[in-house]
Amino acid sequence: MARSLKKGPFIDDHLMKKVEALEEGGKKTVIKTWSRRSTIFPNFIGHTIAVYDGRKHVPVYVTEDMVGHKLGEFAPTRTYKGHGADDKKTKR
């Protein structure tokens, strides 16, 4: 279910402060965050945000198409290794 429009988008304050500080300084450093629940705002465009996936920080370069989505959508938490091999030869 989508978030109510009267509430507005959610973003953690500490993440917004870090992005604003980068914009003032003009530096292009990676921002580490554990906040997968934060919505991507237009002022994030062009920055790289390292989102925690439960094991490591996955670098996510924010583009214009990502605005309005959550940061966690771009850092998958599960790694798919593939299905098991067919063991028909060993069963004989």
Swiss-Prot record:
Coiled coil: none annotated. Gene3D superfamilies: 30s Ribosomal Protein S19, Chain A (3.30.860.10). Keywords: Ribonucleoprotein, Ribosomal protein, RNA-binding, rRNA-binding. HAMAP family: Ribosomal_uS19 (MF_00531). The keyword tRNA-binding does not apply. Transmembrane segments: none annotated. Protein S19 forms a complex with S13 that binds strongly to the 16S ribosomal RNA. The keyword Transport does not apply. One of its GO terms (molecular function) is structural constituent of ribosome. NCBIfam families: rpsS_bact (TIGR01050). Disulfide bonds: none annotated. Belongs to the universal ribosomal protein uS19 family. This is Small ribosomal subunit protein uS19. GO terms for cellular component: cytoplasm; small ribosomal subunit. GO terms for biological process: ribosomal small subunit assembly; translation. SUPFAM superfamilies: Ribosomal protein S19.
